[in-house]
Amino acid sequence: MAKLPEARNALAFTTFEEHAPFTTFPGAASFIKGFHERGAKANLPSTSVDLLASIAYASWQVLEAAANGAKSLDDKALAAWLRKNHVDSVMGRLYWEGPTNYVMGKDIYKVKQLQDGKWVVV
């Protein structure tokens, strides 16, 4: 998409990019390094960390933190622990509030724009 003329100044949302401030989150640098190394070894055409990769990785971080915190794999125990605690992830600090269980966090969602063929957080 970045190479198409029609995509100039396109907007998208993101929760993770391979630059600051995203790379300051706990484990982000090692996550990026590992993703690049494994992607290159697998001969992937692109080894850039994208939104979906970071969400998947953070999901496992959340599950690990909840299982360790609740000392259980019971879904009700995990949910109860998550409602009372936050999880520091590669996407930043995550927490859950209210009946919807919507993932919250300070400034998690950002807008990025395609500028000169590169995505830039605006």
Regions found by a protein language model. Give the residues of each.
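Segments of small-molecule ligand-sensing domains
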Residues: 38-121
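Extracellular/periplasmic periplasmic-binding protein-like sensory domains
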Residues: 1-57, 119
